[in-house]
Amino acid sequence: MKNHRLRAFTLTDLLVLVACLSVLGTLLVTQFSRMRANSRRTTCAGNLARVSRAILDYANDHRQSLPAGDPSDHRDIWWWYKEMVKSYAGLRGESSAQDTLFACPEDRGYSSPTPFHRNPHFDYSSYVFNGVTLPGMPNISGLPLAAVKRPERTLLVMEWTAHAPLSWHESRTGRQNAPFYSDAKSVVGFVDGHVSFTPIYFDGYNAAYTQDPINGYDYQYSAK
C-alpha cells in the first residue's frame, strides 16, 4: 500500500511538471513570435526610412520637386518611382528580387500570393509612393516640396497595405487580404522624413488611398 501511494504521488507530480513545462513552452513560443514580429517590423521601418531619404534626395537634385510620371509611359509612377530614386539609395543596375532595401519581410502580396518585393510588375518593391495619379485621387506626384503644406502629416511613401487598408504586422485577417478594415496599421513615411507605424482610416467602402482620413488620424494623402 505504501509503495502504491508513492507511485501515485510520483505520477501526479510528473503530470504537474509536464503541464508547467507546456505552459512555459507556450509562453516562450509566444514571446519569441512577438520578438520576431517586432524585429521584422523594425527592418521594414528602417528600409522605409532609407527609401524616404532617397526620394527626398532625388527631389533635392530635381528643382526640389518630387518624382512625376511620364504621360507617354504606361508604368504607373506610384511603383515605378523606384527607377527614379534607387540610385540615391546606392542601388545600380536592373531592379530584382535581390533589392532587399525595398523589401518588407512581412510582405504577402495582394491579388497574387507573390510578395510585392518579388513581383516584377511592381518593380520588386514593398513600398508605394504617394503618387496615385488616377483622376480625383489625392497625391503629391511631381509637386515641389514647398507645395506640401503639412510635411509632418503628408505621406511620402508607405507599405502597400496603407492603400487598402490592411496590415502585414498586426493582421486581423491572418494571411488573407480581405476584408479591408479601419485602423489597420502600416509602416509609413512622411514628407518631413519621419517614419511611423500608423492606423489607416477606412470608411467601409472606398480604398484608403482615395481620400484623406477623417479627423483624429495623423496622416493625409493630399498636399493641402
Where are these regions (language model features)?
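Amphipathic alpha-helical segments typified by the pilin-like N-terminal helix
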Residues: 6-46
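N-terminal secretory signal peptides that target proteins for export/translocation
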Residues: 1-4
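Short, well-structured segments within or immediately adjacent to enzyme catalytic domains
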Residues: 42-224
